[in-house]
Every structure is written in C-alpha cells, then in structure tokens.
C-alpha cells in the first residue's frame, strides 16, 4: 500500500507544471540534492496536488493532515472539498456508524455552508437524531444546495418527530436553495403546503423527487409538482398518490421525457382490500410521451388485496412482489405486461406455476431478469422457460427448493440444460445451513 501511494505521488509530481524535472548534466550534485529535498518536502507541494490527494482521503484523515502546515490547512478549506457532505447522527454507542462531531457541524455551518451543494443526513432510529438533523437543516440559510437526501437507517425516525418542526426546517431549505435538482425525502412528514413552496422556488431546476411513504402528501400535492416542474425526470411515490391526472400531467407536451417512475404499492389503512384503478388510456399517454421510461412497481400486499391490478395492459418494466402472489395475478403478467424486463417473486405458496411462467416467457419478450423464492416450478417447465428466453436472460436467481423434479429432469440434470440455453455456467441458489 505504501509503495502504491509513493508511486501515485511520483506520477502526480511528475505531471505537475509547478515541478520541473532536472536535466542530466545541467546541475551540480548540490543542486540535485536541493531538488530532491524539495521533492521530499510535502509542505511545498502545489495547492492543486494537495487538493487532489485530499479528495481521496476520508474527512477525519483530511482534518489530521490539515494540521501538518499552514499550506495544507489552506487547502483543507478550499470550497471544492466541501461541495458534498453527509451528516451522520445517532444516539446509540452500538450504532454501526459514527456521529458527526458537533464542533465539526458548527464549523461547516459557519465556514462552508455557502459551498455545500450535495447534502445528505443519515440518522438512526431515534427521534432525537431526526430532530438534530432538522436543527442543522434550519441553519442552512446561506447556501444553494442542489441535492438533498434524508436517510433513516432503521425505522423511519423522521415520521416520529413533530410534523411542524420538520416542515419548518425543510421550508427554510426550500426557500433559500433555489437550484434544487434532486430530493430524497422518503418516510418523512412532508406535506402539500411545503411541496408548494418547493415548486414556487425550484420548479425550473427539479429533476428527481423521491417521496415514497410520505403520509401527509395527497395526490393533489404530487400533481402540483408534476404540473409545474416540467423538467422532472425521476419520481418515486406511493400508489395512493398515483392518478390518471398525474400520468396525463407527466405526459404533457411541455414536460420532458420521464425516465424513471417508481411506485410502492402497500395498504395505507388496516384492512384495506380495494385499490383504485388507473385507466389504460392514461398509461398509453405516458408511454407515447416517454417511450423509454422505466416503470418500477414494488408490491407489499396480500393476495386478496391485489384484485385491481393487471386486468388491463400495464407498462411496468420492473416488478417486485414482497409477499405471496397468486397464480391468477402471475397469469395476468404474461398477458398484460409486454414491457416487463425484471420479475422477482418472493413467494407463491404450494401451487405449481408452470403455465404462468411459460406464458411470461412467451409474451414478455424483453424479460432479462427473474428471481423466484418459496414457489414451485417443475424442472421441465423451468427449462422450457429458459429456452424461450435464451441468452437475453442475464440475471437468473432461483432457490433450489423452488425446482420440483419430474419424469423428464432431475435436480442433478437441470444445471446442464439451463447452462446450455443461457450460454454460461448456471446453478440454482442454495440456502446456507448455518
């Protein structure tokens, strides 16, 4: 490692315009000695060389290095090193990440707030950490942040804090940063009025908005964002926010092409078994306007809650079922999801899904990835599925317990046949025994 670092330093020094290489025969041995001494004196390195080194160092190492000399301390405060920062906040000594020191937080707010552009807050499950994050947010008044991310590493701690406190802190940022382009505020108490402030100040710059599991945002609130933020390219939301009006707004001729739409489908109320449907015409309008959009859907529903879905053609490209899904729903996928490229089924029960799987292979011509767990598929049907998909099936993750031996193929034979059709060595996944 030390040799590699020295080699890297030599390359940097040799390429530096501030360090001229000695010509053989042109200097006395004394001059050469002074030159070597200068090269070995890291305190005399040009600013841009030290800056490049600092960019590879973790913050704590950078801070230690800044105490070497005045020159390095000056580089430590160069704005380029403070464009991106992640505040880490926790209340537990057992946490896997260290909390950002309070003195450093205050130094950043006082000296580098104006330089911050890409800011994230990583908090643990405690409400105190979420409140501390909001306390920092409310002080970022002299900055122009472009990217904001609020990350809860465990349960959504932002949802447990005072809604008014959170909204107040977020509003300060929305008002003072007028060039926000990417925002991740999932699992937070953000509401419609604060989104209106976001739109009023950042409608021309917003490109990405991730706000799944925000219970205080209505379908009208997200519609306001779509109507005014014509440059929005990526959007993540819950299904209850999705509406025909929203899809039509995203399909407006003045709106840029949408690139990524993520939809989390889960019960918003205990006992809810009915969900609103989206008209096929609305989906068609979106695909006509944005033909390359990835429509990603995550389902966290029970079988009886899924009756509404996939009765008509749906342009989903990536589909994940986090709970058990019925044979009937899987059968609809092959008939009504022609754009499907990735399918993950966590469970299906004890019903064999041979027919459904082959139907998907026959009609979903773009399918490149499949994951199955806690399902049952006969070895013959699985091999036929792989044969129909062929080498375009680049990701195939199947638990060994899913495959049921039949009269034609045994578990010992299946990997050879599957490998032949995939054009690469393949084995089913095996559950570890520990």
Swiss-Prot record:
Keyword Transcription: no
Lineage per the UniProt record: Eukaryota, Metazoa, Chordata, Craniata, Vertebrata
Protein's pathway: Protein modification; protein ubiquitination
Subunit organization: Part of the SCF (SKP1-CUL1-F-box) E3 ubiquitin-protein ligase complex SCF(FBXL21) composed of CUL1, SKP1, RBX1 and FBXL21. Interacts with CRY1 and CRY2.
The entry's keywords: Biological rhythms, Cytoplasm, Leucine-rich repeat, Nucleus, Repeat, Ubl conjugation pathway
GO terms classed as biological process: entrainment of circadian clock by photoperiod; protein ubiquitination; rhythmic process
Name of the protein in its database record: F-box/LRR-repeat protein 21
Location relative to the cell: Cytoplasm, Cytosol; Nucleus
Domain named F-box: residues: 39-85
Ranges of the LRR repeats in the UniProt entry: 187-213, 214-239, 242-265, 322-347, 349-374, 375-400
Cellular component GO terms, alphabetical: cytosol; nucleus; SCF ubiquitin ligase complex
Described purpose of this protein according to its UniProt entry: Substrate-recognition component of the SCF(FBXL21) E3 ubiquitin ligase complex involved in circadian rhythm function. Plays a key role in the maintenance of both the speed and the robustness of the circadian clock oscillation. The SCF(FBXL21) complex mainly acts in the cytosol and mediates ubiquitination of CRY proteins (CRY1 and CRY2), leading to CRY proteins stabilization. The SCF(FBXL21) complex counteracts the activity of the SCF(FBXL3) complex and protects CRY proteins from degradation.
Organism: Bos taurus (Bovine)
Gene from which this protein is expressed: FBXL21
Any matching Pfam family: F-box-like
